[in-house]
Amino acid sequence: MKNIYNTYDVINKSGINFGTSGARGLVTDFTPEVCARFTISFLTVMQQRFSFTTVALAIDNRPSSYAMAQACAAALQEKGIKTVYYGVIPTPALAHQSISDKVPAIMVTGSHIPFDRNGLKFYRPDGEITKDDENAIIHVDASFMQPKLEQLTISTIAARNYILRYTSLFPMPFLKNKRIGIYEHSSAGRDLYKTLFKMLGATVVSLARSDEFVPIDTEAVSEDDRNKAITWAKKYQLDAIFSTDGDGDRPLIADEYGNWLRGDILGLLCSLELAADAVAIPVSCNSTISSGNFFKHVERTKIGSPYVIAAFAKLSANYNCIAGFEANGGFLLGSDVYINQRLLKALPTRDALLPAIMLLFGSKDKSISELVKKLPARYTYSNRLQDISVKTSMSLINLGLTDQEDFLQYIGFNKHHILHSDVTDGFRITIDNNNIIHLRPSGNAPELRCYAEADSQEDACNIVETVLSNIKSKLGRA
């Protein structure tokens, strides 16, 4: 006799929560029953708002992802819904196919979070689910049977259409004389990227492919990855290095010297190349984006793509070409746009390829570093402390809200005072030398993130390392 489960009970006991982008938690908590529960609840909410008979499904390269996808597919089958399984592809490739076919989608991915975790990201037929959708999903009360896991057959249509989305914009192979390194690691799009850049004319050099999952965080690039990029650029005479996080929605791009570009600088350059009228960006992005008169309007939001997407509704009422981007490199196209007189449809989800392609298109007759040098000299940096609970992070933030002097002492900046504070997302302060320090708990993992902005890259890096070092010491982690 099969066990019958209640969705509301299962999720409340699971330890899985919605984070900045999707439901995230420990792999051990993503049991087949929990995956099925989320799937049934998502399906229930979508059926209340849309008409469809199919759900699209894909995964990243985490070892746990395939079994989770099997559980999702089994739950859909029980409810009479067909599953189209696209295998290992980038999240934006799945989103693009989902929106094109007007069907919901589920991406099994933990993105950049630690190896022992994973996640589920959900898409409506018109794009990412909203925070209201998330709330509805966790409150669905429905019954379902214990899922029976079966093998899944892969369709390659989504990968092909994602490549075509970008290659169709360029009648000529504009990367013909460029050498592009692809830092493959375990990225979901590593094979797809090689194909695409070759089709655009580039000589592609494959770098550091890994058979084991590597959780690359584009917002906290390791010293090892920084050193490797510099070595690769020189050794292989590269014009650029392209990589992504695990599920291919956040880009990581280095110039011809192997210097990784900050995600918000990449997003700015892409938006300028697209001639965007207005942009939505999280509060953690470089302040010069707002002050530099690059756009008719800049809307600042909380951190996370759902908040950027929510801002698109406001912007679209007044502006024709709108985009959004984040400090982690995620780029979201909020409106249709023409490139080379060819239509590129909106894709309101994080996409690693568009900013990379537009940067390379903008630098086809020059170097990437030349483009960057034209921007105002204001620099950002970020890093994190792992295994820090939300409770601990919030205690530190609350200290800043209640006693600024003690807070500055705690983080090692007691010789300064605060000129301005912002609590849009966490605690962001401007101190008396115009440097910016920003602390917030990660929405996806038990981590404390620190962002800094200064007039030199060295100063920005030193601020972050000083803050995190002091916090580690105070917490007994030194």
Swiss-Prot record:
Enzyme Commission designation: 5.4.2.8
Catalysed transformations (reactions): alpha-D-mannose 1-phosphate = D-mannose 6-phosphate
Cofactor: Mg(2+)
Transmembrane segments: 30-46, 265-284
GO biological process, one term: UDP-N-acetylglucosamine biosynthetic process
Function: Involved in GDP-mannose biosynthesis which serves as the activated sugar nucleotide precursor for mannose residues in cell surface polysaccharides. This enzyme participates in synthesis of the LPS group C2 O antigen.
Pathway entry: Nucleotide-sugar biosynthesis; GDP-alpha-D-mannose biosynthesis; alpha-D-mannose 1-phosphate from D-fructose 6-phosphate: step 2/2; Bacterial outer membrane biogenesis; LPS O-antigen biosynthesis
Keywords: Cell membrane, Isomerase, Lipopolysaccharide biosynthesis, Magnesium, Membrane, Metal-binding, Phosphoprotein, Transmembrane, Transmembrane helix
Family annotation (PROSITE patterns): PGM_PMM (PS00710)
Cofactor stoichiometry and binding remark: Binds 1 Mg(2+) ion per subunit.
Pfam family for this entry, one: PGM_PMM_III
Topological type in the membrane: Multi-pass membrane protein
Protein name as it appears in the record: Phosphomannomutase
Positions that bind Mg(2+): S111, D245, D247, D249
Family to which this protein belongs: Belongs to the phosphohexose mutase family.
Entry-linked InterPro entries: A-D-PHexomutase_a/b/a-I (IPR005844), A-D-PHexomutase_a/b/a-I/II/III (IPR016055), A-D-PHexomutase_a/b/a-II (IPR005845), A-D-PHexomutase_a/b/a-III (IPR005846), A-D-PHexomutase_C (IPR005843), A-D-PHexomutase_C_sf (IPR036900), A-D-PHexomutase_CS (IPR016066), Phosphoglucosamine_mutase (IPR050060)
Record: active site: S111
Compartment(s) where it occurs, according to its Swiss-Prot or TrEMBL record: Cell membrane
